[in-house]
Structures are given as C-alpha cells and as structure tokens.
Amino acid sequence: MHLVVTSPPYWNLKRYNETPDQLGHIQDYESFLRELEKVWKHVYRVLVPGGRLVCVVGDVCVARRDFGRHLVFPLHADICVICRRIGFDNLNPIIWHKIANASYEVANGSKFLGKPYEPNAIIKNDMEFILMQRKPGGYRKPSDAQRDASRISKEDFDHWFQQIWNIPGASTKQHPAPFPLELATRLVRMFSFVDDTVLDPFCGSGTTMIAAFRTGRNSIGIEIDPEYCQMSARYLKAENSSLFSNAKLLLEKVDTAEAHLVQEDQVIYEARPAKKKLE
C-alpha cells in the first residue's frame, strides 16, 4: 500500500449498527485503543517504506449525565502515541474546522455546553484532527510519468498544505461519521501518485475509494458492516459506469470465521481502476 486514508470509529460516541466485532460498541476506552492498535499494526505492515497513514479523528467529548462530569478522551493524542510505539514517525497534523455539523459530535451540543452565558462553560467541539503518520525507510521515487500526471497546481498546493482546513461536514443521514469527498480527494492527491494503491480499513460508505477512483489511483476498502458494504458497492458501481469504463471492480466478502474469501455481489472488499491486488 502506498497510502492509507481512513477514519476509525470515535469509540462509542456515535451510534453504529449492531454488527459483530464493531469497535464502536466497545465500552471500555482502553480496550478500544488496544483493538485499534491491532489495525494500525497491520497498516504499518502493508505500507511501503515512506508511505503514510492519514487518520481523520475527533476527540471524544462526554456529557456530565454519562460520567458525572464533563470529560474529553484525547483520542487523537492516544492514536499518535500508539502509532509512534508501533514505529511510525509522527508528522504535523491538519486541523479540520468543521463549518457545519459540529453539534452532532457531542451527541447533544446544547446540553453539553453547560449553562449559557456563564463562566466555566465547555468549549464548543467543532474541529477534528487529520493525523499524519509516516512509515520510515526512504522516500518514494515515482516515474516521471507519474510525477507529471500527479502534479498539484500552485493554487491548490498553497491552499491544501496549510495546517487549518475549513470544510463543511458531510451529511450523517447515510452514515453516522462520514467525511466529505473534498477532504478525501485532497488527501489522496497530496500524498499519493497516479496508479498508487490507497487503502481504507474503515471504508464506511466508500468516500476514500471514490476519491481514489476519480484521481486515477487504485483502492482497497475494508468494512465490517454489511449495510455500509452494500452502500459502498452501489456508489462505486455508479462511479465505474459513469467515469471509468476500463475499471475493474472486485466485490468480495471475507468470512473471518473460516478465514477465506467468498464472492458476493453486494459486498465490497476491493475496487481498483488499474491492475494491482492486495498481497
């Protein structure tokens, strides 16, 4: 893998479907982090030297009614610590200021903020972190053709390679924690080259994979929830029919109990506009 762009569950902050082994249903925060660490270890294993893990995540704010006091679990910081322990190099993050949708992040924004217009209220939670983790071992050496096909305009470069982004949050009607296609597209273009392979181990509704498709990258998505797998498959098939007549879509179901792959038309495991396959 040349690049990983993903957004893991925000612990149990959001309501995910009842799916076996769903990380978002783990009640103990430390147990959740241990399970998440297993994913990052596999990500580190499959990344090429110099490849990046880009992780979109927000801290977990809990209300007084849940813990007896207002509390923030610093998920972004804990992920950085875990990744450094695995062997990643921590790089500067991007701060994503979510122009809309922020009240959803605290489950009930109006009650979480405390008494209005009085001192000691709780700071509004309207930002997320785009964490940058790099696997050591060298720098990419793409071909001249890849470089030319992957160039970013000066205007976009100056705008994207800043530490604060102002992008509206995506609708939560279809998925409880989506991120905008614009955000995924920027990240794919910033940290990969045309014909590279991009992985999303928490692919949800397939936003990262669509961004990869539209920018000429291969993509692999993994999702545990059958409903979101079907959603991804529909979106990717639509992209394939409208944009990439020569693309190859591989739709597979992974039977974890039997540890083998089962073909199933309605479940998405891998999609790619070119020729590469996950080893």
Range-by-range predicted roles:
Residues 233-274:
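S-adenosyl-L-methionine
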Residues 1-231, 264-279:
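Core catalytic lobe of class I
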